[in-house]
Amino acid sequence: MLKKGNKLITLKGNIINFDESFYGEIMFDEKINQINRVEKKSDDFIIPGFIDLHCHGANGFDTMDGWNSIKKMTEYHLKKGTTSILPTTWTSTFDHTFEALKEFENFKKINSNILGVHLEGPFINPNKLGAQPPLAINPSIDFINKLQELAPIKVITLAPELDNMESFIEEINNHGIKIQ
C-alpha cells in the first residue's frame, strides 16, 4: 500500500475489480475512501494487489534473516504488485524461528503488508524433507503457543501422517490456524 502520512491519495486509471472495469479515480489513505467514475484521460490501470501466502523471501533476501531482509523483500514485492504477504519460515531451531517471528512482528508494527506468518515445519516428515533441513520435530502445541505470543501464525505446513498429529491438528484448528 502507498503510505504518505495522513494524506489522502488519489489515483486515476482503468479500475479493474472482480466483476467490472471502468475508468475512474480511487481516493484512499489507510483504506479506500471513495471510488468515482470519471472521464478517461490515460491508459493506466488500477488493479487489486497480489497476496503471497507462501513467501520465503525475494530478490536475495530471506524471511529468516532479520528486520533488514524483511524490509528489503517487502519493498521488492510491493514494486512487483504483491501488496500483502505471509512471510514463510523454513524448518529451523526454536530459537531461530522465535527470532524470525519477533522480527516479523516488529516490522509489521510499521508496515501493514504482513498479514501474519506461514510456519513451514518443523512438523514435517523426516523422510520427505524436500528442501527443508533435517530438523523436523514432533508436534508440540507448546511450541506453537510460544510462537503465537510473538506473531499471529495464520498457516502451518505439516505432515499429517506423523504420530500424534491428529490431536495436534485439532488443537491447531482450535487456534484458527489453517493447515497445509
Task: Please place each PLM-identified region on the residue numbering.
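A conserved glycine-rich beta-strand in the N-terminal activation segment of trypsin-fold
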Residues: 20-28
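Short amphipathic alpha-helices and their capping/turn segments at secondary-structure boundaries
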Residues: 35-43, 98-111
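Generic structural signal for well-ordered alpha-helices
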Residues: 74, 98-105, 144, 169
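Metal-dependent catalytic neighborhoods of phosphoester/phosphodiester hydrolases
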Residues: 62, 95-105, 130
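Histidine/acidic residue-rich metal-binding segments in metalloenzymes
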Residues: 6, 138-180
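Active-site mouth loops of central-metabolism enzymes
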Residues: 56-68, 130-138, 180
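Divalent metal-dependent hydrolysis catalytic cores, especially in the metallo-beta-lactamase
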Residues: 56, 71-100, 113-125, 151-161, ...
